């Protein structure tokens, strides 16, 4: 018995030594990083805003550095060349997502487009999204919806101005922009409006419930959940994050199921052209794949990724224009020349407005809606630059830092739309990601932002509240909104009266 016990002990020791040797070999030549604290690693570096924290760390440790969040290795990439290497040479290896608490509960156990790891299911979701949901033909079919919601925005601003006697009137754009983008997306998805005070909200109680769900989801997605890295904290759940995730997931699921059932029963007055209608038609021929579960995940993804981001970007664009009146003047001149002083701009006109496109590109460079790309996860060992990156490493790309790096941008912190007159400069903007997991909603975002900003410039004269420039500091939130919401003075121009529902 003693012999067998000794043999077993020896085998155990040899196995542990082999595992430690393999692990140490894998962990050799990691990117450099700050010192760690026992157990928590570098969790004390999880300070908001993360993109600024990581930019500061990159100035000490270089364009690629390591952090240990508990027992999980995180590699932060802060240069365009390394980011391109991640999503070209290592694109498939880094095409997975880490498993966080929100993915388990809110994103249907990691099965939605944004949370699923690379594989057949994700490829099918991507195909459905690009071909059936966000194709150019599909987006063109909803042009009337987007035009109507943008016109409503202009009309409400016009009403605000008229009520004050047609002179310069103080307006706050954020609530109006949020209302416009969410209503446009919900009408494309389900044919319903849930925001606004213009008497055209489909169901007041249902609308209130929807707004509460979206608000809570945004709050949870922006939460700093250390339990994702220290399992003990998840068990304790001091912040009640797990309970909140379960609760909002249940509410969201019931809400989305209700929407789908309404369409299935034909209780919603639509022409059958909404995204839900289209997906339900596909489910008739392929019910095993186009399940309610899949449809709910697609709807949720469009709402969370395609609404707040556009509203936030439009607010940043208008703020930069107010801080740079010479740029605003040049944009107005382009609209007058290319579209005409008596003709309202439309989505189809955006290709004629290169300077407006440059303004938007420069805004996305300085104020990307996702300052850190969604986290990637390595499925096997790889190298990035000269460093080893082991399997099961979380990769974070600091787009905000890359976009403001003076090594890669001339006069990097200045707002200069003219820099994008060189066509190759546009390709350096990473606001919508890179590689196979880049955001599929790029075309919709470009249409929404370009059309809305064009109309705001055409229909109103804009000024700051005072001589002092606007505060361009970012606030909290996954989409990096302005810390201080934009308040500006606007005065209606005659062409604003041509806007009709």
Swiss-Prot record:
Keywords: Endoplasmic reticulum, Heme, Iron, Membrane, Metal-binding, Monooxygenase, Oxidoreductase, Transmembrane, Transmembrane helix. It is a single-pass membrane protein. Expressed constitutively in leaves and stems, but not in roots. Induction: Up-regulated by methyl jasmonate and herbivory, but only weakly by elicitor. Heme binds at residue 439. CDD domains: CYP81 (cd20653). InterPro entries: Cyt_P450, Cyt_P450_CS, Cyt_P450_E_grp-I, Cyt_P450_sf, Plant_Cytochrome_P450_Monoox. Its EC number is 1.14.14.88. Optimum pH is 8.0. It catalyses: formononetin + reduced [NADPH--hemoprotein reductase] + O2 = calycosin + oxidized [NADPH--hemoprotein reductase] + H2O + H(+). Its cofactor is heme. It is found in: Endoplasmic reticulum membrane. GO terms for cellular component: endoplasmic reticulum membrane. Involved in the biosynthesis of the pterocarpin phytoalexins. Acts on isoflavones with a 4'-methoxy group on the B-ring, such as biochanin A, formononetin and 2'-hydroxyformononetin. Has a low activity with daidzein and pseudobaptigenin, and no activity with the 7-O-methylated isoflavonoids isoformononetin and prunetin. Belongs to the cytochrome P450 family. PANTHER family: CYTOCHROME P450 82C3-RELATED (PTHR47947), ISOFLAVONE 2'-HYDROXYLASE-LIKE (PTHR47947:SF24). This is Isoflavone 3'-hydroxylase. The lineage of its organism: Eukaryota, Viridiplantae, Streptophyta, Embryophyta, Tracheophyta. The gene is CYP81E9.
């Amino acid at each position: 018995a003693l012999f067998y016990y000794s043999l077993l002990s020896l085998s155990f020791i040899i196995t542990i030594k082999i595992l430690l040797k393999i692990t140490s070999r894998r962990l050799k030549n990691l990117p450099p990083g700050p010192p760690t604290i026992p157990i928590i690693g570098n969790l004390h570096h999880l300070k908001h805003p993360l993109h600024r924290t990581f930019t500061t760390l990159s100035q000490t440790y270089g364009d690629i550095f390591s952090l240990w969040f508990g027992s999980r290795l995180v590699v932060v990439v802060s240069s365009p060349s390394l980011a391109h290497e991640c999503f070209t040479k290592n694109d498939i290896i880094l095409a997975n997502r880490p498993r966080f608490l929100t993915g388990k509960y809110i994103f249907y156990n990691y099965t939605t487009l944004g949370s699923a790891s690379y594989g057949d299911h994700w490829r099918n979701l991507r195909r459905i999204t690009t071909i059936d949901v966000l194709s150019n033909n599909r987006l063109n079919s909803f042009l009337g919806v987007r035009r109507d919601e943008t016109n409503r925005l202009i009309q409400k601003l016009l009403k605000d101005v008229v009520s004050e006697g047609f002179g310069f009137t103080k307006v706050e754009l954020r609530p109006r922009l949020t209302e416009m983008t969410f209503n446009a997306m919900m009408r494309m998805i389900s044919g319903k409006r849930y925001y606004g005070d213009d008497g055209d909200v489909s169901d007041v109680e249902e609308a209130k419930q929807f707004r509460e769900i979206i608000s809570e989801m945004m709050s949870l997605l922006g939460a700093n959940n250390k339990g994702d890295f220290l399992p003990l904290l998840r068990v304790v759940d001091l912040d009640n994050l797990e309970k909140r995730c379960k609760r909002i997931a249940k509410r969201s699921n019931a809400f989305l199921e209700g929407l789908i059932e309404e369409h299935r029963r034909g209780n919603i007055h639509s022409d059958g052209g909404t995204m839900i209608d289209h997906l339900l038609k596909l489910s008739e021929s392929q019910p095993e794949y186009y399940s309610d579960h899949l449809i709910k995940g697609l709807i949720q993804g469009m709402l969370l990724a395609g609404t707040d981001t556009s509203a936030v970007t439009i607010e940043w664009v208008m703020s930069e224009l107010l801080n740079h009146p010479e740029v605003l003047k040049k944009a107005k001149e382009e609209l007058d020349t290319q579209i005409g002083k008596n003709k309202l701009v439309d989505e189809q006109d955006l290709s004629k407005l290169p300077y407006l496109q440059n303004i938007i590109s420069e805004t996305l460079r300085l104020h990307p809606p996702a300052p850190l790309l969604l986290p990637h996860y390595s499925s096997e060992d790889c190298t990035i630059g000269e460093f080893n990156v082991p399997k099961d490493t979380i990769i974070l790309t600091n787009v905000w830092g890359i976009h403001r790096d003076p090594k890669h941008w001339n006069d990097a912190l200045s707002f200069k739309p003219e820099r994008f007159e060189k066509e190759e400069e546009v390709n350096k903007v990473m606001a919508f990601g890179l590689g196979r997991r880049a955001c599929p909603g790029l075309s919709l975002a470009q249409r929404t932002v370009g059309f809305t900003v064009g109309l705001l410039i055409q229909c109103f004269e804009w000024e700051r509240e005072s001589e002092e420039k606007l505060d361009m500091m970012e606030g909290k939130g996954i989409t990096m909104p302005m810390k201080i919401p934009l308040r500006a003075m606007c005065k209606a121009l005659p062409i604003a009266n041509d806007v009709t529902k």
